Amino acid sequence: MLHNDIFNFLRLGTYVERADYTLRTVYSKYHRLLPTANVIGGSESQSQWEVMLRSLSAWRSLNWLKKGRIDPFSVADFLIFDQRMPRSINFCYYEVVSNLTDLARLYKKEYKSLDLARTLCCQLKKDRAKNIHKIDLKYFITEHIIKNNELGSIIADDFNFV
């Protein structure tokens, strides 16, 4: 496939939707990322994380990286910040910026969606610098679901998809 504007639009849709799916999956399993005293380290907690990670095609990768020692914070860190994981929020936003940059260069125009995507990437870098233990995860995920939807709407406006 040619790497032209059609390719960029396909990839934009892929990564905006992928970020949304990851965010919503983590949000729906949020309570499982906060283990109770009777579940911590048990087979039940491991199976809960495994199911969530498998739904995002992330189980094998994280298990390999952590050598089988998976905890709630490593799951959240991996799915949100790890640039090596194609379904992580960080990876998706990086790809959105890359494809919007290609479109801006091709059409010789700046777009609001590119500014927002860059802002989201910068915010993720700042949040990554914080310890994952210090982030209010539920608020963080909720905010990014809203911002991701806003990004999709602005992309639609910028390129007259509405």
Regions found by a protein language model. Give the residues of each.
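Alpha-helical transmembrane segments and their helix-helix packing motifs
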Residues: 1-162
